[in-house]
């Protein structure tokens, strides 16, 4: 399932990048955001997002994979069985940060050692 999510994420990322013709600068960074545990059943194992940051082009976005629809019938049962339909969302880092801080959940950022050509 994780491989499917990563594949979907990279397809979406490439689609967005090509559709908007975004060129990242030499200062761009990519990082993994690991979020702490939450009290709800769906947050018991934490969460992960991918952050793309480029101060030159004022880009600071998080691709949040593993999102799901809370209105799914039998949500908890399907979640426990691993039978939910997951999808990728994106939004500003500041919104992502404030959402997790409001829930008193830590965020650990690991900047990936990528060259500009790899980004």
Across the structure, where does each feature detected by a protein language model lie?
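Short, intrinsically disordered, charge-balanced linker/junction segments flanking boundaries
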Residues: 110, 114-119
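Active-site-adjacent bridging/hinge elements
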Residues: 22-25, 119
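Boundary at the C-terminal end of the N-terminal hydrophobic targeting segment
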Residues: 17-21
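Glycine-rich catalytic cores of cysteine/serine-nucleophile enzymes that process amide/ester linkages
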Residues: 25-111
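Sec-dependent N-terminal signal peptides
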Residues: 4-14
């Amino acid at each position: 399932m994780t491989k499917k999510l990563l594949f979907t994420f990279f397809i979406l990322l490439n689609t967005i990048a090509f559709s908007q013709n975004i060129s990242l600068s030499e200062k761009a960074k990519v990082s993994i955001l690991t979020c702490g545990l939450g009290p709800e059943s769906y947050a018991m194992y934490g969460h992960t997002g991918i952050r793309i940051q480029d101060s030159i082009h004022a880009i600071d976005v998080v691709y949040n994979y593993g999102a799901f629809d809370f209105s799914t019938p039998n949500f908890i049962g399907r979640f426990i069985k691993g039978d939910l339909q997951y999808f990728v969302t994106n939004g500003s880092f500041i919104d992502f940060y404030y959402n997790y801080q409001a829930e008193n959940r830590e965020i650990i950022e690991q900047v990936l050692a990528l060259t500009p050509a790899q980004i």
